Amino acid sequence: GARLVEAGADVIAISDPSGTGEILGPRFFEEYAVTYLNMLLDGIEDGKTKTIVHICGQMRSVYQQINMVHSNALSFDAIVPMKEARRNLGERVLMGNVSTFALEFGDEEKVASLTKFCVESGSNIISPACGLGTKSPLRNIQAMLKTLKKEQNVKLAP
């Protein structure tokens, strides 16, 4: 992380696709995922660089533990109900979770609907749930941005 900070990174995102609560359960999630994520995150802190931690899978059993992660934002898979995450994580900055599958294979209306739902459910940063498929049509990404602009009255660069 220090090298990324030295290189001028504004944000560092850490993805942990296998450290999910549904696989590890609360005890092992805290012991392994939280402990080692925090070691990484604490090594990045320079007062300016922000951090995002993305974890795949269901989080229901580990909300208490995920709240111990020292990141600026928490990003979740599309299977995590954002309303539930918001209820359990309070004022934490939450990111996501527009379905990556829908962005690649769905239509514009589906993407717009999912984006609106994420906004209404309490996501602070709207983004694809688990990245962007290489064949995601530009029109679907544009639909996500247009919906976000409409829902949050946000000005986006042309």
Q: Which stretches of residues belong to each language-model region?
A:
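Active-site loop segments of alpha/beta catalytic cores
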Residues: 1-158
